[in-house]
């Protein structure tokens, strides 16, 4: 059965789910929700996602929202299909979960407001919060140093295999790398930059960029 994904393919959270689908070889259909016209806030979409965000999925009678929950669900449902994203043992899965949580609580809390202020607001003709941006860059640098140290002795965040721990970072990283200052911050950290170059060379990422019009 084809999974229906409601969202905008250029948005980071739908991209997280799409990357999972592409890594697992899951058939999907994208139902476009236009974020620029706030379609996600309309009553019909609020029935799918009561907080007015994207993505949401429909898989037959099964419905789910929140990108990380969706990605984990399909990585589990299709554990034996495509890339193993969850880990090969209980201990490995715990490390995958650990670094996926790091993405949520340490990385994304900085990446998301940076993307909003440096990419989305200028596109909408709005002013960014310069003071906030500079503070976020400093904090991001500290986080990237920790990642760089981790990746100096590990090929990927959870060890020697690409997993959900890596995948969940990719949409925001794609946006951050288009920001000159942050691109330079990444390239100044050799192990972190090596990791990004490797994961952004995966077929799933290249296919996603085509879907997103890049």
UniProtKB/Swiss-Prot annotation:
One Gene Ontology cellular component: cytoplasm
Superkingdom of origin organism: Eukaryota
Location in or out of the cell: Cytoplasm, Cytosol
Gene deletion effect: Great reduction of anthocyanin pigments in the vegetative parts and brown pigments in the seed coat. Accumulation of unextractable proanthocyanidins.
Species this protein is from: Arabidopsis thaliana
Alphabetized UniProt keyword annotations: Cytoplasm, Detoxification, Stress response, Transferase
Presence of the UniProt keyword Transferase in the record: yes
Descriptive protein name: Glutathione S-transferase F12
InterPro entries: Glutathione-S-Trfase_C-like (IPR010987), Glutathione-S-Trfase_C_sf (IPR036282), Glutathione_S-Trfase (IPR040079), Glutathione_S-Trfase_N (IPR004045), GST_C (IPR004046), GST_Phi_C (IPR034347), Thioredoxin-like_sf (IPR036249)
EC number in record: 2.5.1.18
Similarity comment text for this entry: Belongs to the GST superfamily. Phi family.
Cited Gene3D superfamilies: 1.20.1050.10, Glutaredoxin (3.40.30.10)
Catalytic activity: RX + glutathione = an S-substituted glutathione + a halide anion + H(+)
Residues annotated as domain GST C-terminal: 89-214
């Amino acid at each position: 059965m084809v999974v229906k994904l409601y969202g905008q393919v250029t948005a980071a959270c739908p991209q997280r789910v799409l990357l999972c689908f592409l890594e697992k070889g899951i058939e999907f259909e994208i139902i476009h929700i236009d974020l620029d016209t706030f379609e996600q806030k309309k009553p019909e979409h609020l029935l799918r996602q009561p907080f007015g965000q994207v993505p949401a999925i429909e898989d037959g009678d099964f419905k789910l929202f929140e990108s990380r929950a969706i990605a984990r669900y399909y990585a589990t449902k299709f554990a034996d299909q495509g890339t193993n994203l969850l880990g090969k043992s209980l201990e490995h899965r715990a490390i995958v979960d650990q670094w996926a949580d790091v993405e949520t609580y340490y990385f994304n809390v900085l990446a998301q407001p940076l993307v909003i202020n440096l990419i989305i607001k200028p596109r909408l003709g709005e002013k960014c919060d310069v003071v906030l941006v500079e503070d976020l860059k400093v904090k991001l640098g500290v986080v990237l140093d920790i990642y760089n140290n981790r990746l100096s002795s590990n090929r990927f965040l959870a060890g020697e295999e690409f997993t959900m721990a890596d995948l969940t970072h990719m949409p925001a990283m794609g946006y951050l790398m288009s920001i000159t200052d942050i691109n330079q911050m990444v390239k100044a950290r050799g192990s972190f930059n090596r990791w990004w170059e490797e994961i952004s060379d995966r077929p799933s990422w290249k296919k996603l960029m085509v879907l997103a019009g890049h």
